[in-house]
Amino acid sequence: MPAVSLPPKENALFKRILRCYEHKQYRNGLKFCKQILSNPKFAEHGETLAMKGLTLNCLGKKEEAYELVRRGLRNDLKSHVCWHVYGLLQRSDKKYDEAIKCYRNALKWDKDNLQILRDLSLLQIQMRDLEGYRETRYQLLQLRPAQRASWIGYAIAYHLLEDYEMAAKILEEFRKTQQTSPDKVDYEYSELLLYQNQVLREAGLYREALEHLCTYEKQICDKLAVEETKGELLLQLCRLEDAADVYRGLQERNPENWAYYKGLEKALKPANMLERLKIYEEAWTKYPRGLVPRRLPLNFLSGEKFKECLDKFLRMNFSKGCPPVFNTLRSLYKDKEKVAIIEELVVGYETSLKSCRLFNPNDDGKEEPPTTLLWVQYYLAQHYDKIGQPSIALEYINTAIESTPTLIELFLVKAKIYKHAGNIKEAARWMDEAQALDTADRFINSKCAKYMLKANLIKEAEEMCSKFTREGTSAVENLNEMQCMWFQTECAQAYKAMNKFGEALKKCYEIERHFIEITDDQFDFHTYCMRKITLRSYVDLLKLEDVLRQHPFYFKAARIAIEIYLKLHDNPLTDENKEHEADTANMSDKELKKLRNKQRRAQKKAQIEEEKKNAEKEKQQRNQKKKKDDDDEEIGGPKEELIPEKLAKVETPLEEAIKFLTPLKNLVKNKIETHLFAFEIYFRKEKFLLMLQSVKRAFAIDSSHPWLHECMIRLFNTAVCESKDLSDTVRTVLKQEMHRLFGATNPKNFNETFLKRNSDSLPHRLSAAKMVYYLDPSSQKRAIELATTLDESLTNRNLQTCMEVLETLYDGSLGDCKEAAEIYRANCHKLFPYALAFMPPGYEEDMKITVNGDSSAEAEELANEI
């Protein structure tokens, strides 16, 4: 249909529609659209229909918006406005590739339209189409050479394409156009100079970068960045004396910065340990109260010299009452010799302080205050906890609590000791005690909630967090709004442990949405940073966004989701009623009656909770409606609701698992778990080449990893058994690669070789035992013996590994072995007396963890039981 041109009156109305859209006056814009479209001559005016659709989209009416924009486009295919509007609509739905196509079509009909070019450049940088971004920025530079954003955008395009020299030339040409006095301090010009220097450094032009820095030093506001950069450049250029002077100057600014001491070491190049120590001894004299110059030598000293320096460091900290001293020294615990020296010194302090209130009976000087002994005991509790002696650790912390029962840090450490000893419920109880001492401390509140979640006390954790969340909304919803991912990952783990897979997956998807939001949020910064010239931070932001899903929170959420989907594939959820019928078929009348009572109570409790939840939801909806009515313009539509039941009953769990796996394969290649999870998925999908690829990638990271060994045996065995059904090409590739991985052997021999090579490691023995049973179920007895050995000479004979062995005995990986499991549990209970996992079968916790001792719900339930 040919385009209809508007007469002056309607054209003026159309311009007002554009202004209303720009100023977010959407309802006024719709009125003007109506005035044009109500005229029969212009009822099908393409550009007006498109603008009406765009306005409706901003009011959340998405379907109607798409219909109108498409109708407008059909009526005027040669209109750049219609194509531009269609692109904006696609952009609002995060369909960036489609939006780019629309913008390109718009530019066919108006190639020099600045707004379309700017919008296109934003999408190109968002999608990291760097070649396209460079071309678009070049067009913008040609059209608006006087605008600084045109120059800077073009330079950034070359910088991101790693053509540093070209980027530096463009920035220099632009800098010449800036009229600034050498004595005038201009923040934006200062940032431009620092960005230019960064580009020169990344280009490897260190000499030019140093000259540039010295030339414009007076005009740069960030003096600290100037000095730090100068120090790095002087080191790169081997001007070591000058570099040493710079780092000494930086030390005077901040004697507690570790990096300045490392820089000074590089500049002075000490030949031996004593020369290296001399650097720090000079700092002791200059900064007598400095902790860092006393702490850093402990990393490289040993023997008597280490003991002497450690003695001074510990005395200084214990006298001052410095709680984080253990965390400061934690990295030294990798060295057994240093651990022994630490223990000797601190135990000696405790003995001496008790007898004569001095660190050493031979000391001359004033007596230490009673608090010094407290901090020594506090340290010793953490020390013995770290080296795996919880009983001694508890003795020290209990003594400290008896002397000072109001110090929160003591209760925190007691909770940690119980957690490390395997009793998370007792740990949560003590963390709750700590929280009760200071209910206004948000850190303790969060710590307490975290421990409760680890103990699977989700409701109690939510109540704990509600003390610091917004009133009027539930704590969970508010924490989700605030992107509180530590809470959500812990929640997901707790729900998974309770086999509430739907709820766990909901949390994983909420975390996934946070990362999508963070990626989308960078959109606003593409224009803001150009305008404000915060270019160093902008480039850092872009680099961070590229690897965002490397973050531990995403990895944890993805791991939990993948593990759940693998379980759902292996054991799909069945109808609950059928399960209950099967469970109750063999019960006695008394047991059945007890079960029915329990079910009724659970049903009643669930009903009350549901009513409470609905009431909260209604209240929240009323608040949202009120907010919507008050706010003249509501933008965007609601997100799709995450329903746990639907998430748990997904038809293709492996496909869903792959969605979480893909970012890990791209960004977390260095973690072996990524490739082993990939193997587990492809093994179930029977994708042999992808299984082989996953095993090879994992093998390159850690060839002797226990889980990798299991994967290799399963691949080897499956390939041997099922190779006849594969195509010739796949079979040939498999044969070649398998020979490289395994040599001329069979799965059984390969497993035996692995066992001989790692016979002193408990995790490796467990994996080998699993494979013994997997390859030959008649060898169950030998497999159980291999897994359940608790010899003192074994490495990694820790709580976590022993729990994994017990779980293996229970889950059927070694066949039916309940008797062996019970014997192993009893043996482990002697080794780890506090661990809940190894408590006797009749053992029941006599305490319930609730928020600050409120156990009314538990008392009511107990009364019902009686």
UniProtKB/Swiss-Prot annotation:
Domain of life of the organism encoding this protein: Eukaryota
Function: Auxillary subunit of the N-terminal acetyltransferase A (NatA) complex which displays alpha (N-terminal) acetyltransferase activity. The NAT activity may be important for vascular, hematopoietic and neuronal growth and development. Required to control retinal neovascularization in adult ocular endothelial cells. In complex with XRCC6 and XRCC5 (Ku80), up-regulates transcription from the osteocalcin promoter.
TPR repeat copies, ranges: 46-79, 80-113, 148-184, 224-257, 374-407, 409-441, 485-522, 672-705
Gene: NAA15
Subcellular location: Cytoplasm; Nucleus
Protein name: N-alpha-acetyltransferase 15, NatA auxiliary subunit
Comp. bias intervals (Basic residues): 595-604
Subunit structure: Component of the N-terminal acetyltransferase A (NatA) complex composed of NAA10 or probably NAA11 and NAA15. Interacts with XRCC6, NAA50 and XRCC5. Associates with HYPK when in a complex with NAA10. Interaction with HYPK reduces the capacity to interact with NAA50.
